[in-house]
């Protein structure tokens, strides 16, 4: 199976999201799948203002669309809601492609702590982003309950391969 994973979180960041995606791609390859990752590498980026280790891709739409089209995946997984994730979601929506997504961290709380943007606004964005997904993978029961509370649709745990 050809599996495409799109993520805004990648090396040189060192965090749980990056480690999880790196290990997931390795395990999928061990099972014989062809795995490609779309990461900020190869895109024009700027550092995230409140977290400079995060590289935000600038204007990734056309390149992401081309990469998805060229790879022609059997499975599209969008792991983050940043510029690359948004570009992949847009391509999938415009072209009728199903995709799965993931919610890794308490993003709205993180945004609120740094900007005081009300949680309701960030959760509204997440609801819009993930409700088009066939399946939203979450790391824990606690995170699942949080997202259900904010009406983010049907969720399923990520599972170790």
Predicted regions and their residues:
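Short N-terminal targeting/anchoring amphipathic segment
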Residues: 64-85, 95-100
């Amino acid at each position: 199976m050809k599996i495409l994973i799109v993520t805004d979180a990648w090396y040189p960041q060192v965090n749980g999201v990056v480690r999880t995606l790196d290990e997931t791609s390795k395990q999928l390859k061990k099972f014989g799948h062809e795995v490609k990752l779309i990461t900020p590498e190869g895109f024009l980026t700027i550092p995230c203002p409140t977290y400079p280790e995060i590289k935000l891709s600038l204007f990734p739409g056309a390149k992401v669309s081309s990469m998805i089209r060229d790879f022609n995946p059997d499975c599209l997984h969008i792991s983050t809601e940043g510029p690359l994730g948004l570009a992949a979601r847009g391509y999938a929506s415009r072209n009728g492609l199903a995709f799965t997504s993931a919610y890794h961290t308490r993003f709205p709380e993180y945004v609120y702590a740094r900007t005081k943007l009300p949680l309701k606004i960030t959760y509204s964005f997440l609801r819009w982003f993930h409700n088009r997904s066939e399946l939203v993978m979450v790391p824990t029961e606690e995170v699942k309950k949080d997202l259900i509370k904010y009406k983010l649709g049907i969720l399923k745990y990520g599972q170790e391969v």
